[in-house]
Amino acid sequence: MSLDKGTKEEITKKFQLHEKDTGSADVQIAILTERITELTEHLKRAPKDHGSRLALLKLVGQRRRLLDYLNSTDTKRYQTLINKLKLRR
């Protein structure tokens, strides 16, 4: 379950720090959050899809590590991002 190009560009434009920013932690976390949301919806329809469930757990772990990194380097940006994405942390 990957994101289509248009969705990815839209998320990138919304969360980028400057015009050419495509790889900052903010953008990566936002893209991972969208992928996690899509996989969660997929797993509601197909609860026996264990491969997707494992992929979901991997993505959640990756997002958690990026959030921890952002929190340790720039707490204000971390809080802003969590509020924008409506994450429970």
Swiss-Prot record:
Entry-linked Pfam families: Ribosomal_S15 (PF00312)
UniProt record, GO biological process: translation
CDD domains named in the record: Ribosomal_S15p_S13e
InterPro entries registered for this protein in UniProt: Ribosomal_uS15, Ribosomal_uS15_bac-type, uS15_NS1_RNA-bd_sf
Gene3D superfamilies per the UniProt record, alphabetical: 6.10.250.3130, S15/NS1, RNA-binding
UniProt entry keywords in alphabetical sequence: Ribonucleoprotein, Ribosomal protein, RNA-binding, rRNA-binding
Molecular function terms, GO-annotated: rRNA binding; structural constituent of ribosome
SMART domains the record matches: Ribosomal_S15 (SM01387)
A single Gene Ontology CC term: cytosolic small ribosomal subunit
PROSITE patterns: RIBOSOMAL_S15
Family assignment from sequence similarity: Belongs to the universal ribosomal protein uS15 family.
Cited function: One of the primary rRNA binding proteins, it binds directly to 16S rRNA where it helps nucleate assembly of the platform of the 30S subunit by binding and bridging several RNA helices of the 16S rRNA.
Oligomeric form and interacting partners: Part of the 30S ribosomal subunit. Forms a bridge to the 50S subunit in the 70S ribosome, contacting the 23S rRNA.
Descriptive protein name: Small ribosomal subunit protein uS15
High-level lineage: Bacteria, Pseudomonadati, Chlamydiota, Chlamydiia, Parachlamydiales
Gene coding for it: rpsO
